[in-house]
């Protein structure tokens, strides 16, 4: 799975983390109509 940037969309699955550009890990958070990524 490719790295994603802070704020990019993710699939909304809390346990499906992706790496960030700085080699940190992302977690998903939920907006009313979309999911986002925080690292």
UniProtKB/Swiss-Prot annotation:
Localisation: Secreted
Alphabetical keyword list: Calcium channel impairing toxin, Disulfide bond, Ion channel impairing toxin, Neurotoxin, Secreted, Toxin, Voltage-gated calcium channel impairing toxin
GO cellular component, one term: extracellular region
PTM per Swiss-Prot/TrEMBL: Disulfide bonds are present.
Tagged with keyword Secreted: yes
Tissue: Expressed by the venom gland.
Location, primary (coarse class): secreted
Record's keyword annotation contains Secreted: yes
Ranges in a coiled coil: none
Molecular function as annotated in GO: calcium channel regulator activity; toxin activity
Job of this protein: Omega-agatoxins are antagonists of voltage-gated calcium channels (Cav).
Similarity comment: family membership: Belongs to the neurotoxin 04 (omega-agtx) family. 03 (type II/III omega-agtx) subfamily.
Name of the molecule in the record: U2-ctenitoxin-Co1a
């Amino acid at each position: 799975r490719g790295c994603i940037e802070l704020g990019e969309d993710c699939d909304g699955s809390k346990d499906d983390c992706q790496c960030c550009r700085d080699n940190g890990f992302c977690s998903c958070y939920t907006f009313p109509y979309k999911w986002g990524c925080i690292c």
